Amino acid sequence: MLFLAFHAGSWGSWCCCCCVITADRPWDRGRRWQLEMADTPSVYETRFEAAVKVIQSLPKNGSFQPTNEMMLKFYSFYKQATEGPCKLSRPGFWDPIGRYKWDAWSSLGDMTKEEAMIAYVEEMKKIIETMPMTEKVEELLHVIGPFYEIVEDKKSSKSSDLTSDLGNVLTSSNAKAVNGKAESSDSGAESEEEEAQEELKGAEQSGSDDKKTLKKSADKNLEIIVTNGYKGSFVQDIQSDIHTDSSRSTRSSEDEKPGDESSQQTGHTIVCAHQDRNEDPSEDASGIHHLTSDSDSEVYCDSMEQFGQEEYYLGGDPTQHLESSGFCEDAQQSPGNGSIGKMWMVAVKGKGEVKHGGEDGRSSSGAPHRETRGGESEDFSSVRRGRGNRIPHLSEGPKGRQVGSGGDGERWGSDRGSRGSLNEQIALVLIRLQEDMQNVLQRLHKLETLTASQAKLSLQTSNQPSSQRPAWWPFEMSPGALAFAIIWPFIAQWLAHLYYQRRRRKLN
């Protein structure tokens, strides 16, 4: 406590300040703490009050209508939290609603107010997501805070472990022998590019001719993705004639030797494709042949890039779909007849497989061939490796353009050009199916009408005798027939009497 005393005079003034501080007693501190706690409500009370406001603010005809059981729960928890245990007598039979409320309240027993508040808020959490977002609901959410529990899923952890182990297996450089072939997987394009670079470095040491070819391919900055193929020797045998344009015979003859030497030294597969002589030389091959791992799975898809490449191959220029491989590529041309077109020689490493979107290429006759624009086809043979590897073909036009290789002979890919005809066939089949369905529906309608008419006729025939005689008539014959049988003798006698009377008059 602080006391200040002041005194002022006419000629002078003096000020006396006396400060007296009383001792802080422990019971005073406990009393003040109780008063402060009484003034500041607890967290449960604030949440309870916010939840009560939400329930009270619900419109009668709103989108959210709680059930009677739910309202009884809220009522019982509210009464228990505000008034404590139920001490009232049960209402009479004339107040059924009051009896239901009393039963719900008394069922809580000796539950404390704090527990009732917590239960009220917990029930509110169950339905708060189905309620419309209002200011009261926002206030309640702000008071409650995040009330979702994070549960660790053991299955997800196991799946993550499996994926990590699978990633380790994929990233490992060890090769596994499967069905007589060496199989190893790469984790992605980066690891494949690294392996390609290592193979390029190893190829540089093979000879000076190979170095020249590798430098030419490196200058083009092409993406090289190498997949694992078959392990074993490869015999290269191509029996085909190369016809090129006479105007570019000089440069092609100079580039022919390095290309052949590099392909023989590195053991590459040579894939022949042709280009029309009328096409612009500037529109050379562009795009990327994506080399993917050829596993034994029947259906798989590497990425969304596959679909983009497919669209590019189906809709692009016929001469712009050959991509230079990083191992060996050279334009091999020889002077001769220039009427057919110029050829591109694409060298692909022997143990690899050239794929586009993970699909195989196969000609209609089952053997690799190359076509010309005039419809001519020139077959060339090759020595196959493994169980099903074959040299793919590249034909001109959007329908015949595909680079691929077979896996184990278990999966055969269709030509990309057949997709258009396949779609047309599917459309025709659907149209015919619709026509057949319409015919079937018409026949069914006719059958239904015939059966209905026959049923009506049968009902009419069955109802005809019953309509001729009433239900109360005991005899089998109709009443008219019976009346005619009774009356006709009298009629006959009357007619005979009339005849005799006329005869007598004539005689008289």
Curated annotation (Swiss-Prot):
This is Acyl-CoA-binding domain-containing protein 5. Its main location: membrane. One of its GO terms (cellular component) is peroxisomal membrane. Signal peptide: none annotated. Residues 181-214, 428-453 form a coiled coil. It comes from the Eukaryota. One of its GO terms (molecular function) is fatty-acyl-CoA binding. It is a single-pass membrane protein. Residues 175-215, 240-300, 318-340, 353-419 are annotated as: Disordered. The lineage of its organism: Eukaryota, Metazoa, Chordata, Craniata, Vertebrata. Acyl-CoA binding protein which acts as the peroxisome receptor for pexophagy but is dispensable for aggrephagy and nonselective autophagy. Binds medium- and long-chain acyl-CoA esters. The modification N6-acetyllysine is found at residue 446. CDD domains: ACBP. The chain crosses the membrane at residues 480-500. InterPro entries: ACBD5, Acyl-CoA-binding_prot_CS, Acyl-CoA-binding_protein, Acyl-CoA-binding_sf, FERM/acyl-CoA-bd_prot_sf. Belongs to the ATG37 family. It comes from Mus musculus (Mouse). SUPFAM superfamilies: Acyl-CoA binding protein. Residues 44-133 form the ACB domain. Residues 198-215, 240-260, 353-376, 408-418 have a biased composition (Basic and acidic residues). An acyl-CoA binds at residues 55-64, 75-79, 101, 120. Pfam families: ACBP. GO terms for biological process: pexophagy.
